[in-house]
């Protein structure tokens, strides 16, 4: 049965055209109705298979079609991945995301991927993966292994999409989201600002996401990281207020979703990041390089959290699993500890 669209393009365009301070006020009010405004979800992302991707996404240094100097690596060993997950947990992350540069996973790799998910879950962390398109069987196997979230971004509006990617259709992306949802895995899907798109395209992306039968539980909003060698390396910078506006509109349109401040934070100053949190962002990637692009150092993130009075969010895990989380929060809030300025060391 077809569901009734929650939003129209004219409604979304109206939001984008609102005076910024009015928009931020509305977004913050909606945010406070559904979330604790002082809590931020902290995730770590690990590239478990890097480079040599056959796709032609114009923004991506992992594509085999562009000379970016990135060295291709095989799928990591399961124990290597779990070691990284332990470190992420000890540094305060509550979700561990594993990304592979594939068009889709091979059947021969599925047992290893299942072991990775099971191992991460055994630590009391939420597990997330992004592996490209999935078929029904693969989605179900990952669900049975305990995968909490699957990330598959739409990237931009359907109208602009063909300017950025030609090796995978928009419908293929939507189909993968359907298969993930049907398998009982939560959906993580967002897009990128700065691809050369118009404001109408940003509205079109958020319209697609918010009008899914069930909106994504997690919506990463990325700012383009311009990598030398990719076709978008010389794109114009995104105005910070335009990015903040996109975060705010996402929060208003998807009030119960986590809105993640994702790639591109390295280029943002503290004031821009603070305004993103004010606009309704309540999730960040922390620590490890964001796949193959830089992410702010952990201690910088924790200093910013302290300045803004934000706390890393705890997840519901087995008793005893939140010990590191409590130590992290204590270090954040206690000026006379060695970890006050470098709580990531705990």
UniProtKB/Swiss-Prot annotation:
Transmembrane segments: none annotated. Pathway: Cofactor biosynthesis; biotin biosynthesis; biotin from 7,8-diaminononanoate: step 2/2. It catalyses: (4R,5S)-dethiobiotin + (sulfur carrier)-SH + 2 reduced [2Fe-2S]-[ferredoxin] + 2 S-adenosyl-L-methionine = (sulfur carrier)-H + biotin + 2 5'-deoxyadenosine + 2 L-methionine + 2 oxidized [2Fe-2S]-[ferredoxin]. Keywords: 2Fe-2S, 4Fe-4S, Biotin biosynthesis, Iron, Iron-sulfur, Metal-binding, S-adenosyl-L-methionine, Transferase. It is an enzyme of class 2 (transferase). InterPro entries: Aldolase_TIM (IPR013785), BATS_dom (IPR010722), Biotin_synth/BioAB (IPR002684), Biotin_synthase (IPR024177), Elp3/MiaA/NifB-like_rSAM (IPR006638), rSAM (IPR007197). One of its GO terms (biological process) is biotin biosynthetic process. Binds 1 [4Fe-4S] cluster. The cluster is coordinated with 3 cysteines and an exchangeable S-adenosyl-L-methionine. Residues 38-256 form the Radical SAM core domain. This is Biotin synthase. It comes from Citrobacter koseri (strain ATCC BAA-895 / CDC 4225-83 / SGSC4696). The gene is bioB.
């Amino acid at each position: 049965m077809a569901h009734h669209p929650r939003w129209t393009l004219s409604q979304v365009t109206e939001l984008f055209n609102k005076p910024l301070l009015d928009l931020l006020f509305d977004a913050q009010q909606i945010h406070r109705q559904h979330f604790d405004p002082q809590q931020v979800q902290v995730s770590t992302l690990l590239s478990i298979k890097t480079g040599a991707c056959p796709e032609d996404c114009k923004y991506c240094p992992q594509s085999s079609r562009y000379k970016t100097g990135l060295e291709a690596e095989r799928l990591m060993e399961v124990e290597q991945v779990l070691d990284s997950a332990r470190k992420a947990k000890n540094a305060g992350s509550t979700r561990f995301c594993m990304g592979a540069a594939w068009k889709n996973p091979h059947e021969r790799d599925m047992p290893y991927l299942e072991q990775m998910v099971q191992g991460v879950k055994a630590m009391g962390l939420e597990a997330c993966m992004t592996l490209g398109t999935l078929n029904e069987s693969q989605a179900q196997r990952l669900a049975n292994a305990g995968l909490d979230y699957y990330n598959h971004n739409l990237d931009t509006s359907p109208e602009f999409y063909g300017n950025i990617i030609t090796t995978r259709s928009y419908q293929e992306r939507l189909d993968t989201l359907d298969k993930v949802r049907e398998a009982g895995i939560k959906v993580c899907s967002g897009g990128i600002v700065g691809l050369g798109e118009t404001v109408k395209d940003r509205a079109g992306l958020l319209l697609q996401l918010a009008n899914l039968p069930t909106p994504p539980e997690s919506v990463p909003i990325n700012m383009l990281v311009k990598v030398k060698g990719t076709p978008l390396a010389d794109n114009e910078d995104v105005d910070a207020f335009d990015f903040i506006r996109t975060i705010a509109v996402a929060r208003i349109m998807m009030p119960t979703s986590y809105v993640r401040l994702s790639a591109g934070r390295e280029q943002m100053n503290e004031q821009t990041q603070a305004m993103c949190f004010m606009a309704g962002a309540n999730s960040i990637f922390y620590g490890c390089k964001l796949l193959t692009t830089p992410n702010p150092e952990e201690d910088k993130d924790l200093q910013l959290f302290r300045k803004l009075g934000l706390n890393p969010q705890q997840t519901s895990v087995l008793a005893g699993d939140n010990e590191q989380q409590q130590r992290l929060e204590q270090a954040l809030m206690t000026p006379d500890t060695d970890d006050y300025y470098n709580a990531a060391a705990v």
